[in-house]
């Protein structure tokens, strides 16, 4: 009987030593996956000359992905994402730079934004008086 008890204890300790780390890793996997979840923020920005998006032909388009990290074809993706985060994704809250000096020439430029910002659909359109005025708004968001 003492040998049987000794074997039982030895097998239990061996099984715990071998299987214990495996059980811990499998229990940690759901927490690791949960911390990697995020709301998507992926946008397509276009620009073209005209009064509205319906009449303007898109001349340039860029992509802007802000989650989990800033990326895309936007030339200043990191700073554009930072500006949008600061306004909570509100494009109307982007203000003009105070140091911009633009002429009063009227050559309308329309910018459109389509996509998803922090999990919510976005459809935005804004017409600027000219290219200089467009580039002065939002510092880098509309500069592409």
Swiss-Prot record:
Disulfide bonds join 66-81, 102-132. One of its GO terms (cellular component) is extracellular region. Residues 1-34 form the signal peptide. It is found in: Secreted. One of its GO terms (molecular function) is serine-type endopeptidase inhibitor activity. Pfam families: SSI (PF00720). The record marks 104-105 as: Reactive bond. Keywords: Disulfide bond, Protease inhibitor, Secreted, Serine protease inhibitor, Signal. It comes from the Bacteria. InterPro entries: Prot_inh_I16_SSI, Prot_inh_SSI_I16_CS, Subtilisin_inhibitor, Subtilisin_inhibitor-like_sf. NCBIfam families: PRK13244.1-1. Strong inhibitor of bacterial serine proteases such as subtilisin. Homodimer. Belongs to the protease inhibitor I16 (SSI) family. This is Probable subtilase-type protease inhibitor. It comes from Streptomyces avermitilis (strain ATCC 31267 / DSM 46492 / JCM 5070 / NBRC 14893 / NCIMB 12804 / NRRL 8165 / MA-4680). The lineage of its organism: Bacteria, Bacillati, Actinomycetota, Actinomycetes, Kitasatosporales.
């Amino acid at each position: 009987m003492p040998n049987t008890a000794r074997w039982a204890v030895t097998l239990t300790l061996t099984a715990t030593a071998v299987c214990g780390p495996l059980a811990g890793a499998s229990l940690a996997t759901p927490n690791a996956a949960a911390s990697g979840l995020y709301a998507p923020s992926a946008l397509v920005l276009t620009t073209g000359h005209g009064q509205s998006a319906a009449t303007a032909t898109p001349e340039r388009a860029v992509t802007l992905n802000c989650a989990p990290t800033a990326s895309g074809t936007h030339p200043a993706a990191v700073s554009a994402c930072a500006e949008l985060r600061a306004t909570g994704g509100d494009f109307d809250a982007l203000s003009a730079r105070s140091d911009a000096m633009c002429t009063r020439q009227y050559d309308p430029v329309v910018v459109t934004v389509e996509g998803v910002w922090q999990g919510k659909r976005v459809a935005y359109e804004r017409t600027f008086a000219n290219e200089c005025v467009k580039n002065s708004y939002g510092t880098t968001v509309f500069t592409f």
